[in-house]
Amino acid sequence: MVTNEKTVKTSVVSSCTANSCEIRDAFMMIGGKWKSMILYVLASQGVVRFNQLKKTVSGISQKMLTQQLRELERDGLIKRQVFPEVPPHVEYSMTELGLSLGPIYQAVHKWEQENLMAIYKCRRQYDDALI
């Protein structure tokens, strides 16, 4: 089956209702200011301790990191392993499900590389029109 832009638009729109939208739900799982960075760090570094994640994901608060990690764990994208030590030792890593996002992130990265200059141009034109 050949998928063109019109087919993609139609299938996405037809699957979205007021109460359910699969594409929106998928973006909620991996999107936002912090989740993409957390997933990137875990995918590139493997097993990472909480404090190392906090240092690597610059600007995130401890509370926000905890919340985002819990959501990612709940969705099955990451695994949390607690070691019963003093002080507590907690490690995070990607699950197979989380690692399956790799091709999606690669496609988004490729799209960004191919279109970034056009996006900057559109932003400049928009901003210039506001002046």
Where are these regions (language model features)?
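Basic amphipathic alpha-helical segments that dock to polyanions
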Residues: 65, 69-72
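Exposed, interaction-prone assembly regions rather than primary DNA-binding/catalytic cores
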Residues: 121-131
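Basic, amphipathic "hinge/linker" alpha-helix immediately C-terminal to the N-terminal HTH DNA-binding motif
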Residues: 84-107
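Short beta-strand "wing" residues that participate in macromolecule-binding interfaces
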Residues: 80
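Hydrophobic alpha-helical core bundles mediating ligand binding, dimerization, or RNAP-core interactions
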Residues: 23, 27, 102-112, 116-119, ...
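N-terminal helix-turn-helix DNA-binding core of bacterial DNA-binding proteins
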Residues: 17-64, 84, 91
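Glycine-centered, phosphate/nucleic-acid-interacting loop/turn motifs that mediate DNA/RNA or nucleotide
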Residues: 76
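Recognition helices and adjacent regulatory flanks at domain boundaries
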Residues: 1, 5-19
